[in-house]
Protein backbone atom coordinates (compact mmCIF):
# COMPACT_ATOMS: atom_id res chain seq x y z
CA UNK A 1 0.00 0.00 0.00
CA UNK A 2 1.07 3.59 -0.64
CA UNK A 3 2.34 5.67 2.26
CA UNK A 4 -0.28 6.48 4.88
CA UNK A 5 1.74 9.47 6.09
CA UNK A 6 -0.53 12.02 4.43
CA UNK A 7 -3.64 13.75 5.79
CA UNK A 8 -5.81 12.48 2.92
CA UNK A 9 -4.77 8.82 3.18
CA UNK A 10 -5.00 8.79 6.97
CA UNK A 11 -8.46 10.37 6.98
CA UNK A 12 -9.64 7.96 4.29
CA UNK A 13 -8.43 4.98 6.33
CA UNK A 14 -10.06 6.26 9.50
CA UNK A 15 -13.38 6.64 7.69
CA UNK A 16 -13.10 3.39 5.74
CA UNK A 17 -12.37 1.35 8.87
CA UNK A 18 -14.79 3.26 11.08
CA UNK A 19 -11.98 4.10 13.48
CA UNK A 20 -12.47 6.47 16.39
CA UNK A 21 -9.02 7.66 17.58
CA UNK A 22 -8.88 7.27 21.36
CA UNK A 23 -7.57 10.28 23.22
CA UNK A 24 -7.08 8.07 26.29
CA UNK A 25 -4.51 6.06 24.33
CA UNK A 26 -2.85 9.04 22.71
CA UNK A 27 -3.97 8.00 19.23
CA UNK A 28 -2.79 10.91 17.12
CA UNK A 29 -1.56 9.70 13.74
CA UNK A 30 1.49 11.25 12.08
CA UNK A 31 0.54 12.62 8.64
CA UNK A 32 3.77 14.26 7.49
CA UNK A 33 6.05 12.07 5.35
CA UNK A 34 9.01 14.39 5.87
CA UNK A 35 8.82 14.00 9.67
CA UNK A 36 8.48 10.24 9.24
CA UNK A 37 11.67 10.13 7.16
CA UNK A 38 13.55 12.27 9.69
CA UNK A 39 12.61 9.92 12.54
CA UNK A 40 13.70 6.86 10.55
CA UNK A 41 16.99 8.55 9.62
CA UNK A 42 17.61 9.43 13.27
CA UNK A 43 17.36 5.75 14.15
CA UNK A 44 20.10 5.07 11.58
CA UNK A 45 18.33 1.93 10.49
CA UNK A 46 20.02 -0.31 7.95
CA UNK A 47 19.47 -3.75 6.34
CA UNK A 48 21.24 -5.48 9.22
CA UNK A 49 19.05 -3.93 11.92
CA UNK A 50 16.11 -5.29 13.85
CA UNK A 51 13.70 -2.59 15.01
CA UNK A 52 10.90 -2.93 17.53
CA UNK A 53 8.18 -0.32 17.09
CA UNK A 54 5.77 0.35 19.94
CA UNK A 55 2.34 1.66 18.99
CA UNK A 56 2.57 1.77 15.18
CA UNK A 57 -0.90 3.30 14.80
CA UNK A 58 -1.82 3.13 11.12
CA UNK A 59 1.71 2.20 10.08
CA UNK A 60 3.11 5.48 8.70
CA UNK A 61 6.47 5.12 10.45
CA UNK A 62 6.38 1.32 10.16
CA UNK A 63 6.31 1.58 6.37
CA UNK A 64 9.39 3.82 6.36
CA UNK A 65 11.27 1.62 8.84
CA UNK A 66 10.44 -1.49 6.81
CA UNK A 67 11.97 0.13 3.72
CA UNK A 68 15.26 0.50 5.59
CA UNK A 69 15.54 -2.29 8.20
CA UNK A 70 16.14 -6.00 7.99
CA UNK A 71 13.22 -6.72 10.33
CA UNK A 72 10.54 -4.58 11.97
CA UNK A 73 8.52 -5.96 14.88
CA UNK A 74 5.48 -3.76 15.52
CA UNK A 75 3.58 -4.11 18.81
CA UNK A 76 0.00 -2.77 18.83
CA UNK A 77 -2.48 -3.07 21.69
CA UNK A 78 -5.57 -1.76 19.87
CA UNK A 79 -7.48 -4.50 18.01
CA UNK A 80 -9.06 -2.17 15.46
CA UNK A 81 -5.73 -0.56 14.61
CA UNK A 82 -4.14 -4.00 14.41
CA UNK A 83 -6.68 -4.98 11.75
CA UNK A 84 -5.94 -1.79 9.81
CA UNK A 85 -2.19 -2.45 10.05
CA UNK A 86 -2.62 -5.85 8.43
CA UNK A 87 -3.83 -3.94 5.37
CA UNK A 88 -1.42 -0.98 5.37
CA UNK A 89 1.58 -3.27 5.87
CA UNK A 90 0.46 -6.03 3.50
CA UNK A 91 3.22 -7.32 1.25
CA UNK A 92 6.03 -6.23 3.54
CA UNK A 93 7.67 -9.55 4.33
CA UNK A 94 10.11 -8.06 6.84
CA UNK A 95 7.36 -6.82 9.18
CA UNK A 96 5.97 -8.89 12.04
CA UNK A 97 2.84 -7.60 13.75
CA UNK A 98 2.39 -8.49 17.40
CA UNK A 99 -0.88 -7.91 19.25
CA UNK A 100 -0.14 -7.06 22.85
CA UNK A 101 0.64 -4.62 25.62
CA UNK A 102 4.23 -3.40 25.39
CA UNK A 103 4.32 -2.95 29.17
CA UNK A 104 3.94 -6.71 29.57
CA UNK A 105 6.29 -7.81 26.79
CA UNK A 106 9.67 -9.39 27.44
CA UNK A 107 11.37 -7.68 24.50
CA UNK A 108 14.43 -9.93 24.41
CA UNK A 109 12.30 -13.06 24.40
CA UNK A 110 10.02 -11.65 21.71
CA UNK A 111 12.88 -10.65 19.40
CA UNK A 112 14.79 -13.89 19.99
CA UNK A 113 11.68 -15.93 19.21
CA UNK A 114 11.11 -14.15 15.91
CA UNK A 115 14.79 -14.21 14.90
CA UNK A 116 15.09 -17.85 15.95
CA UNK A 117 18.09 -17.23 18.19
CA UNK A 118 18.58 -18.11 21.83
CA UNK A 119 18.38 -15.14 24.19
CA UNK A 120 22.05 -15.68 25.04
CA UNK A 121 23.04 -15.09 21.39
CA UNK A 122 20.63 -12.25 20.74
CA UNK A 123 22.18 -9.28 18.90
CA UNK A 124 21.28 -5.77 19.97
CA UNK A 125 18.24 -4.13 18.41
CA UNK A 126 16.63 -0.71 18.26
CA UNK A 127 13.33 0.59 19.62
CA UNK A 128 11.27 3.28 17.93
CA UNK A 129 8.05 4.59 19.47
CA UNK A 130 5.54 7.40 19.51
CA UNK A 131 4.70 7.27 23.21
CA UNK A 132 1.45 8.76 24.50
CA UNK A 133 1.73 10.76 27.71
CA UNK A 134 0.03 8.21 29.97
CA UNK A 135 2.49 5.44 29.15
CA UNK A 136 5.78 7.34 28.74
CA UNK A 137 7.24 6.84 32.22
CA UNK A 138 6.01 3.23 32.74
CA UNK A 139 7.29 2.05 29.36
CA UNK A 140 10.64 3.81 29.81
CA UNK A 141 11.10 2.17 33.21
CA UNK A 142 10.22 -1.21 31.67
CA UNK A 143 12.60 -0.79 28.73
CA UNK A 144 15.54 0.60 30.70
CA UNK A 145 15.46 -1.23 34.03
CA UNK A 146 14.89 -4.64 32.42
CA UNK A 147 18.31 -4.36 30.77
CA UNK A 148 17.06 -5.64 27.45
CA UNK A 149 19.54 -5.86 24.55
CA UNK A 150 18.51 -2.46 23.24
CA UNK A 151 21.23 -0.39 21.58
CA UNK A 152 19.21 2.79 21.24
CA UNK A 153 15.72 4.20 21.43
CA UNK A 154 14.22 6.88 19.21
CA UNK A 155 11.12 8.20 20.95
CA UNK A 156 8.52 10.80 20.13
CA UNK A 157 7.02 12.19 23.32
CA UNK A 158 5.12 15.26 24.46
CA UNK A 159 7.56 18.16 24.43
CA UNK A 160 7.26 18.80 28.17
CA UNK A 161 8.14 15.17 28.90
CA UNK A 162 11.08 15.30 26.53
CA UNK A 163 12.50 18.36 28.26
CA UNK A 164 12.15 16.57 31.61
CA UNK A 165 14.19 13.66 30.24
CA UNK A 166 16.94 16.07 29.14
CA UNK A 167 16.94 18.38 32.19
CA UNK A 168 20.02 19.03 34.30
CA UNK A 169 20.24 19.61 38.09
CA UNK A 170 18.79 22.93 39.18
CA UNK A 171 16.46 23.31 36.20
CA UNK A 172 12.69 23.53 36.62
CA UNK A 173 12.16 20.37 34.53
CA UNK A 174 14.72 18.28 36.43
CA UNK A 175 13.20 15.34 38.28
CA UNK A 176 13.25 11.60 38.85
CA UNK A 177 12.60 10.91 35.15
CA UNK A 178 15.70 12.96 34.24
CA UNK A 179 17.84 10.85 36.56
CA UNK A 180 16.47 7.51 35.33
CA UNK A 181 16.91 8.36 31.64
CA UNK A 182 20.40 9.81 32.07
CA UNK A 183 21.51 6.94 34.33
CA UNK A 184 20.87 4.38 31.59
CA UNK A 185 21.25 6.44 28.39
CA UNK A 186 22.73 9.47 26.70
CA UNK A 187 19.71 11.48 25.50
CA UNK A 188 19.79 13.97 22.63
CA UNK A 189 17.16 16.01 20.78
CA UNK A 190 16.49 14.94 17.20
CA UNK A 191 13.76 17.39 16.25
CA UNK A 192 10.72 19.29 17.45
CA UNK A 193 7.42 18.15 15.98
CA UNK A 194 4.53 20.64 15.79
CA UNK A 195 1.04 19.50 16.71
CA UNK A 196 -0.12 20.41 13.18
CA UNK A 197 1.38 17.24 11.62
CA UNK A 198 -0.98 14.88 13.45
CA UNK A 199 -4.55 13.73 12.94
CA UNK A 200 -6.43 14.32 15.13
CA UNK A 201 -4.40 17.35 16.21
CA UNK A 202 -3.16 17.02 19.84
CA UNK A 203 -3.13 19.95 22.24
CA UNK A 204 0.66 20.09 22.56
CA UNK A 205 3.80 19.83 20.43
CA UNK A 206 6.11 16.82 20.53
CA UNK A 207 9.82 16.17 20.73
CA UNK A 208 11.79 13.33 19.14
CA UNK A 209 14.68 12.14 21.29
CA UNK A 210 17.43 9.64 20.63
CA UNK A 211 18.50 7.68 23.71
CA UNK A 212 21.78 5.84 23.23
CA UNK A 213 21.99 3.09 25.84
CA UNK A 214 25.11 3.14 27.97
CA UNK A 215 27.18 -0.04 28.16
CA UNK A 216 27.42 0.70 31.88
CA UNK A 217 25.54 3.24 34.03
CA UNK A 218 27.04 6.71 34.37
CA UNK A 219 27.57 6.17 38.12
CA UNK A 220 28.20 3.00 40.09
CA UNK A 221 25.69 1.99 42.77
CA UNK A 222 25.43 -1.15 44.88
CA UNK A 223 21.66 -1.50 44.67
CA UNK A 224 19.80 0.14 41.77
CA UNK A 225 16.38 -0.32 43.35
CA UNK A 226 17.50 1.49 46.49
CA UNK A 227 19.24 4.19 44.43
CA UNK A 228 15.99 4.97 42.64
CA UNK A 229 14.06 4.90 45.93
CA UNK A 230 16.39 7.65 47.15
CA UNK A 231 15.85 9.61 43.93
CA UNK A 232 12.06 9.30 44.11
CA UNK A 233 12.03 10.32 47.77
CA UNK A 234 14.05 13.44 46.97
CA UNK A 235 11.62 14.55 44.27
CA UNK A 236 8.30 13.41 45.74
CA UNK A 237 8.31 16.40 48.10
CA UNK A 238 10.15 19.04 46.12
CA UNK A 239 9.64 21.86 48.63
CA UNK A 240 11.35 19.94 51.40
CA UNK A 241 15.06 19.97 52.14
CA UNK A 242 16.89 16.79 51.20
CA UNK A 243 17.16 15.98 54.92
CA UNK A 244 13.40 16.03 55.41
CA UNK A 245 12.53 14.49 52.04
CA UNK A 246 14.65 11.40 52.73
CA UNK A 247 12.76 10.86 55.97
CA UNK A 248 10.11 9.01 53.94
CA UNK A 249 12.62 6.17 53.49
CA UNK A 250 12.18 5.21 57.13
CA UNK A 251 15.67 6.02 58.41
CA UNK A 252 16.36 7.92 61.61
CA UNK A 253 17.20 11.56 61.01
CA UNK A 254 20.62 11.04 62.55
CA UNK A 255 21.37 8.30 60.00
CA UNK A 256 20.33 10.59 57.14
CA UNK A 257 22.45 13.43 58.55
CA UNK A 258 25.41 11.07 58.73
CA UNK A 259 24.88 9.93 55.13
CA UNK A 260 24.62 13.50 53.85
CA UNK A 261 27.73 14.53 55.76
CA UNK A 262 29.59 11.54 54.35
CA UNK A 263 28.57 12.60 50.86
CA UNK A 264 29.54 16.21 51.53
CA UNK A 265 26.00 17.47 50.96
CA UNK A 266 24.41 20.36 52.84
CA UNK A 267 21.21 18.95 54.44
CA UNK A 268 19.41 22.22 53.62
CA UNK A 269 19.67 21.64 49.86
CA UNK A 270 16.66 20.47 47.88
CA UNK A 271 16.54 17.32 45.78
CA UNK A 272 16.32 19.15 42.46
CA UNK A 273 19.81 20.59 42.99
CA UNK A 274 21.51 17.20 43.38
CA UNK A 275 23.44 15.54 40.57
CA UNK A 276 23.66 11.85 39.72
CA UNK A 277 26.90 11.23 41.63
CA UNK A 278 25.46 12.92 44.72
CA UNK A 279 22.40 10.67 44.67
CA UNK A 280 24.70 7.66 44.23
CA UNK A 281 26.83 8.76 47.17
CA UNK A 282 23.78 9.19 49.41
CA UNK A 283 22.43 5.76 48.49
CA UNK A 284 25.79 4.10 49.17
CA UNK A 285 26.28 5.73 52.57
CA UNK A 286 22.69 5.11 53.68
CA UNK A 287 23.13 1.39 53.08
CA UNK A 288 26.11 1.11 55.44
Curated annotation (Swiss-Prot):
Its main location: cytoplasm. PROSITE patterns: RRNA_A_DIMETH (PS01131), SAM_RNA_A_N6_MT (PS51689). One of its GO terms (cellular component) is cytosol. The keyword Nucleus does not apply. The keyword Cytoplasm applies. SMART domains: rADc. SUPFAM superfamilies: S-adenosyl-L-methionine-dependent methyltransferases. It holds the Pfam family RrnaAD. This is Ribosomal RNA small subunit methyltransferase A.
Amino acid sequence: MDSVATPGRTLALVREKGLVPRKSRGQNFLVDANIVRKIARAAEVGPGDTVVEIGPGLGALTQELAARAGLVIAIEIDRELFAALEETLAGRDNVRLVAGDALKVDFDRLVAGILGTGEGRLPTYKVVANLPYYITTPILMHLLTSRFRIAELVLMVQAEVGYRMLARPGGKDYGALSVVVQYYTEPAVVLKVPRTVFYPRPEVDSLVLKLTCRTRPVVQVEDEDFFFRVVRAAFNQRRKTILNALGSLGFEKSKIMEALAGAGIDPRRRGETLGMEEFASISRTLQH
